Amino acid sequence: MPSIKLQSSDGEIFEVDVEIAKQSVTIKTMLEDLGMDDEGDDDPVPLPNVNAAILKKVIQWCTHHKDDPPPPEDDENKEKRTDDIPVWDQEFLKVDQGTLFELILAANYLDIKGLLDVTCKTVANMIKGKTPEEIRKTFNIKNDFTEEEEAQVRKENQWCEEK
C-alpha cells in the first residue's frame, strides 16, 4: 500500500498509509490538489496546526478505524446521543483535558468527522448533569460574573430550566 509523509508543526515526520491518511478530508483534498491521489511522494505534507504528540494519536485513531464505514451525515433534527462511544474509543480518550482539547482541534482542522464526534461526545459527557459550578471546577474555569450579572443571566435563560 502506498504511503505518504506527514509533517507535524514541530517538524516530526510520520510515514502513513495513504488510505489511512485520507480519513482526513483536509489531507485527502491536499493530495488531490497536489495530484498525489494514490501514489506516495517523498515531500512531506505539512500540518502546521498539529504537533507531533497529537498527530501520533490521530494516526493511531485513524489506523484503528481504517475499515469503518464513513460516519453518517448529521441530521440537524435528530437529537445527538453521547452514550454510544465505542469501548476502544473510550479507552483511547482517557487522556488529560489538554490532550483531549488538542485532539478536538486537530480533528476539526483535519476534518476527521468520526474522531471529532467521539472527542466532542467525551467532553459532553464530562458536562452532562453538572451544575455550572461543577462544570467550572471540572474545566478550571474562573467565574467572572458579578452576582448581579449572574442573576440577570439566570433570569434571561429561565425558560431553559422549565420542565
Swiss-Prot record:
Gene3D superfamilies: Potassium Channel Kv1.1, Chain A (3.30.710.10)
UniProt PTM comment: Undergoes autophagy-mediated degradation in the liver in a time-dependent manner.
GO cellular component terms, A-Z: centrosome; Cul7-RING ubiquitin ligase complex; cytoplasm; cytosol; nucleoplasm; nucleus; PcG protein complex; SCF ubiquitin ligase complex
Residue positions where Phosphothreonine is found in the record: 131
CDD domains: BTB_POZ_SKP1
Subunit structure: Interacts with KDM2B, forming heterodimers. The KDM2B-SKP1 heterodimeric complex interacts with the PCGF1-BCORL heterodimeric complex to form a homotetrameric polycomb repression complex 1 (PRC1.1). Component of multiple SCF (SKP1-CUL1-F-box) E3 ubiquitin-protein ligase complexes formed of CUL1, SKP1, RBX1 and a variable F-box domain-containing protein as substrate-specific subunit. Component of the SCF(FBXW11) complex containing FBXW11. Component of the SCF(SKP2) complex containing SKP2, in which it interacts directly with SKP1, SKP2 and RBX1. (Microbial infection) Interacts with vaccinia virus protein C9L.
Bridged cysteine pairs (disulfide): none
Region (Disordered): 63-83
GO BP annotations listed: chromatin remodeling; maintenance of protein location in nucleus; positive regulation of ubiquitin protein ligase activity; proteasome-mediated ubiquitin-dependent protein catabolic process; protein K48-linked ubiquitination; protein monoubiquitination; protein polyubiquitination; protein ubiquitination
Cross-link Glycyl lysine isopeptide (Lys-Gly) (interchain with G-Cter in SUMO1): residue positions: 142
SMART domains for the chain: Skp1
Stretches for region Interaction with the F-box domain of F-box proteins: 104-163
The keyword Lipoprotein is assigned to this record: no
Primary role: Essential component of the SCF (SKP1-CUL1-F-box protein) ubiquitin ligase complex, which mediates the ubiquitination of proteins involved in cell cycle progression, signal transduction and transcription. In the SCF complex, serves as an adapter that links the F-box protein to CUL1. The functional specificity of the SCF complex depends on the F-box protein as substrate recognition component. SCF(BTRC) and SCF(FBXW11) direct ubiquitination of CTNNB1 and participate in Wnt signaling. SCF(FBXW11) directs ubiquitination of phosphorylated NFKBIA.
Keywords (A to Z) from UniProt: Host-virus interaction, Isopeptide bond, Phosphoprotein, Ubl conjugation, Ubl conjugation pathway
Membership in a protein family: Belongs to the SKP1 family.
Pathway this chain belongs to: Protein modification; protein ubiquitination
Molecular function GO terms recorded: beta-catenin binding; cullin family protein binding; F-box domain binding; molecular function activator activity; protein domain specific binding; ubiquitin ligase complex scaffold activity; ubiquitin-like ligase-substrate adaptor activity
Name the UniProt record assigns to this protein: S-phase kinase-associated protein 1
